[in-house]
Amino acid sequence: MSSPAPSGTQVQPGSLRPCPGAVSPVVPRRLARGRLESSFSVEAILARPKTRELAATSLPLSTCTSLNLLGAVSQYGVLPWVCSTGSWLPAYLSVGVYPLCSMSCVPGLNVTHHQQGLRLTGSELPYCLGPLKWAPTVDLRDHGTERHTKRVRTTFNLQQLQELEKVFAKQHNLVGKERAQLAARLHLTENQVRIWFQNRRVKYQKQQKLKLPSSSVMEEPSSSSDGNIQSEDAELGIGS
């Protein structure tokens, strides 16, 4: 261990080395004329230690784990996990950027967590050597009520309606091959034809209830195939 230099001894420029792990402030040298050298002169700027060389080493995985850098999750999700070489930062912020962990970045971590855990100043924005990953957006909508998909109502043209009404006047229910042939002739699907006949039967029954007296309200409409209406409605259900 070297003894401290006696008072009056002049310190030669370049004899002091920066402490490892920290950047010592540049001490302005005293010129021969008795005035202090400016810290913004060319000599003072060149004499400063290179920040990038000191920032080449990163903390090991055990240190990152002990500081809870890998498991911390951003509460507010305001800023993404900063993952770049600091080139995107302004000049006055990119000077004091130091790497904290050499592992891949974890989305959801922001600068506030690192400043609280490592007691860093505002200009020392920590970053990680890894690809840029933005924090996932948080959907603030209420997920308690799920929206049901609205059924699209089929629009029939005049020719299709006339043909459907003509067939319904003869037969109130179509099944199997007859329904498939009618759907192909009208350029519709079998499901569209089935739903139209179900709705038309409901409308027909309401009309019959208004016409008939109260004693015959529960009577079914007379048709050759009306006996199969209830069985089909029970299996498929009445749609709208």
UniProtKB/Swiss-Prot annotation:
Principal subcellular localisation of the protein? nucleus
Name the domain of life.
Eukaryota
Provide the residue ranges listed under DNA-binding region in this record. 149-208
Tell me a GO cellular component.
nucleoplasm
Write the record's keywords in alphabetical order, separated by commas.
Developmental protein, Disease variant, DNA-binding, Homeobox, Nucleus, Transcription, Transcription regulation
What SMART domains does this protein map onto? HOX
Clinical disorder: Defects in Noto are the cause of the truncate (tc) phenotype. Truncate (tc) is a recessive mutation that affects the development of the caudal notochord. Mice homozygous for tc are viable but viability is reduced, which is attributed at least in part to spinal injury in the sacral and lower lumbar region.
User: Which PANTHER family does the record associate with it?
Assistant: HOMEOBOX PROTEIN EMX-RELATED, HOMEOBOX PROTEIN NOTOCHORD
Q: What is this protein called?
A: Homeobox protein notochord
Please report the organism this UniProt entry assigns to the protein.
Mus musculus
Q: Which gene encodes it?
A: Noto
